[in-house]
């Protein structure tokens, strides 16, 4: 079985993520959407909320598993799960410059390859951070996120992990 992992914090998951994951599902037998938590970052949504949103929005795709990645190296996670490839979406050359050293290190540590999928043109500008900022200021982000994510964004209840506004 060809198994890949699409890692990320997905805070929140958006249509750019979904497009890359759907394309990965066409390339691999199983794609693990591994949701990470970096304790140095502040999140709008808790890990449980991010897992729930991903599961809701990816339920119709075959061969997708959503799970928390836990602590530790992604390379070790890949080795434990029998993953042959890490799939990363690229929006720009700066994404590539950021991802290439990590891809090289992951290959050296575990032998796992990284597959880069360029984002579709209409998603190049999307980031979870931008979506949260625009939604927080009352902007319409409905064409960029699934309905279940939009509902949570509009609810306006911050997760316990969110950094307080000044």
Curated annotation (Swiss-Prot):
Pathway: Cofactor biosynthesis; coenzyme A biosynthesis; CoA from (R)-pantothenate: step 4/5. Its EC number is 2.7.7.3. Substrate binds at residues 9, 41, 74, 88. One of its GO terms (cellular component) is cytoplasm. It catalyses: (R)-4'-phosphopantetheine + ATP + H(+) = 3'-dephospho-CoA + diphosphate. The record marks 17 as: Transition state stabilizer. GO terms for biological process: coenzyme A biosynthetic process. SUPFAM superfamilies: Nucleotidylyl transferase. Gene3D superfamilies: HUPs. ATP binds at residues 9-10, 17, 89-91, 99, 123-129. GO terms for molecular function: ATP binding; pantetheine-phosphate adenylyltransferase activity. This is Phosphopantetheine adenylyltransferase.
């Amino acid at each position: 079985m060809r198994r890949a992992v699409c890692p990320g914090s997905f805070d929140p998951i958006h249509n750019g993520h979904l497009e890359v994951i759907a394309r990965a599902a066409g390339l691999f037998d199983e794609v693990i959407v591994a949701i990470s938590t970096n304790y140095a970052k502040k999140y709008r949504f808790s890990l449980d909320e991010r897992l729930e949103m991903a599961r809701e929005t990816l339920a119709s795709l075959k061969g997708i598993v959503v799970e928390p990645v836990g602590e530790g190296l992604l390379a070790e996670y890949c080795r434990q799960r029998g993953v042959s490839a890490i799939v990363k979406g690229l929006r720009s050359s700066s994404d590539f410059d950021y991802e290439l050293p990590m891809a090289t290190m992951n290959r050296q540590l575990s032998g796992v390859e990284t597959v880069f999928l360029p984002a579709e043109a209409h998603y190049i500008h999307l980031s979870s951070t931008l979506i949260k900022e625009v939604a927080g200021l009352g902007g319409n982000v409905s064409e960029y996120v699934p309905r279940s994510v939009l509902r949570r964004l509009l609810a306006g209840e911050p997760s316990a992990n969110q950094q307080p506004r000044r």
